Amino acid sequence: MVQKGETREELILGVQKLEAAGIQTSVTFISGLAGPELWQEHAIETGTMIAEMNASYVSLLTLMLQPPCPMLDDYKAGKFKFLTPEEVLAETCLLLQYARPSKPCVFRSNHASNYVSLRGNLPMDNAAMIASLKKCMQDRGLLKDERFRML
């Protein structure tokens, strides 16, 4: 479990207050953070959080671990498993189904850690981004090779 130092509600309220004050916010989420057992819950919780926050910008990275990191220790000990590329895409699809903010939000998933680059505006472009992800799930050749993923 990742300790962020804030609760979900505190993070949402903080973003809402900044946006209400006219300060645009940019928030980043990490795909794969919950591992294979909890990826669906993580996707839904993240998507609904995006919807409730109403941030101006949202970006998505894919989990990669570098030392020193307790999660890396857990991975080496067999206590944590990474999502497969297909699971990361499925998690992102599910997240996008729930990421329906009430005002337009710029969405980017173009970090070097990601298997697929996405760009669009939530919620208007959700369906197109989901379609793009599903196409990539059917053709693994469209995914970024592991050698080119980096932090």
Regions found by a protein language model. Give the residues of each.
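Conserved non-cysteine loop/helix-boundary elements of the Radical SAM core domain that shape
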Residues: 1-22, 32-53, 73-86
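Auxiliary Fe-S-binding modules of radical SAM enzymes
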Residues: 48-151
